[in-house]
From Swiss-Prot:
UniProt-recorded name of the protein: Disulfide bond formation protein B 2
Periplasmic side: 27-44, 86-140
Gene this chain is encoded by: dsbB2
GO CC aspect terms: plasma membrane
Similarity-based family: Belongs to the DsbB family.
HAMAP family the UniProt entry points to: DsbB
Pfam families: DsbB
Subcellular location: Cell inner membrane
Length: 168
């Protein structure tokens, strides 16, 4: 059985994910930044990450459950980091408008598979550099947040791995 302190990795992870979500909604509502398709996809993954961590805190599973939750949370955070890295690349690349042709308002007028593809590819709104803080744009902050959120489940998995190696 994993010690209780490994289970407590999920509470700070949940709180940090919720803080990032609140910050993104605050930027939308107070500053007026409208989310692009990649931002919406990242919010969805961030919400999934927060729900996974919250479920892990509430359920307080055994060793196998903790490892499953950690793997799922790590998958969510790495997928979010990949989307954020793509967003950063789109903002820095020249001539990628043909890659992301549809604005967010028309994404859901298409089939579900096409809408999912557009949410993952991004839209023309994804290239705008409307906001920055400490010389980092919002997608760069998202990438940093997802990478930091990946550290918590990764440390849980590594702690379990080193603990099992120490027993043998």
């Amino acid at each position: 059985m994993l010690p209780a302190r490994l289970r407590t990795f999920f509470l700070p992870a949940c709180l940090v994910a919720l803080a990032v979500l609140v910050a993104s909604f605050r930027l939308e509502n107070t500053v007026g930044l409208m989310p692009c398709p990649l931002c919406l996809s990242q919010r969805l993954l961030l919400g999934g990450y927060a729900l996974l961590c919250f479920a892990a805190v509430l359920q307080a599973p055994g060793t196998r459950g903790i490892l499953r939750y950690a793997r799922l949370a790590l998958g969510c955070s790495l997928a979010g980091a990949l989307l954020a890295a793509r967003h950063v690349w789109l903002q820095g690349a020249e001539g990628v408008n043909e890659v992301c042709p549809v604005p967010i308002g028309r994404v859901f007028e298409q089939s579900w598979s096409e809408a999912a593809r557009q949410l993952l590819l991004g839209g023309p709104d994804c290239r705008s550099l409307a906001w920055s803080f400490l010389d980092l744009t919002l997608p760069e902050w998202s990438l940093l947040a997802f990478l930091l959120l990946a550290v918590l489940p990764l440390s849980c998995l590594l702690a379990y791995r080193f603990r099992t190696l120490a027993r043998t």
